[in-house]
């Protein structure tokens, strides 16, 4: 699962300017936590998906959030809003864990130096994070073992790798085994399945040409493949939204709904737009 290109961005055209600023304030908050807790290099691994998780946990636990303003390399001439709390710090920690294992996987697959260099820069922090979050770290390691087995066996089970991804992300979404743990785990599971399926859907042509593992391959040549794939993706997205609506979240709910109902489809829209452009040529 490529943690650098996940799907939980906002749909900016459907979001109020105030909420869009808050969303990017949380994104910058996670980025600042990465810098302070894990060093400058870790910032290149930041994803929108951990930002979603940070906002989700903030809304659920109604945590006090510190408002700051910073200059940075991305905003060198004007200070920008930065929102931080314990959940942006947790999101940053999870980002480092996920990115580290993903980079190692990239290195094993392609033997390119950049992933190994980045992973080496994160290694010391990962050791500390594994001690701090043993359940989450174990879930990621177990997931990668299961995914490797799927690839080696060239499994034709459409649901196997997606379910493994969901199981892993479900553990990341759960902070502790409290009254909300079951619902949070289910949201994470549905999001994980959606993300894995969407990534695989995007890569189907590339994987077919290169002979890489892709669970969509057995049905990709069928006449109704695109419709069937969209229906499956819609089912996963609907389950994530259904579980989310069980949570008593008031603050930031418009941002979170924007992501769940619209934002997670931005990658799908890009895929379809590229396909349309290709057909025109």
Tell me what each language-model feature is.
Residues 1-10:
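Single conserved hydrophobic/aromatic residue that forms the stacking wall/gate
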Residues 14-64:
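N-terminal ordered "arm"
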Residues 34, 77-94, 119, 123-164, ...:
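Divalent-cation-assisted or electrostatically stabilized phosphate/pyrophosphate-binding catalytic cores
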Residues 45-66, 72-115, 183-206:
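Active-site alpha-helical segments that house and flank conserved acidic catalytic motifs
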Residues 111-117, 248-260:
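Acidic/histidine metal-binding catalytic segments
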Residues 154-198:
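A mid-sequence, solvent-exposed acidic-amphipathic segment
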Residues 262-281:
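Acidic, carboxylate-rich catalytic segments that either coordinate divalent cations
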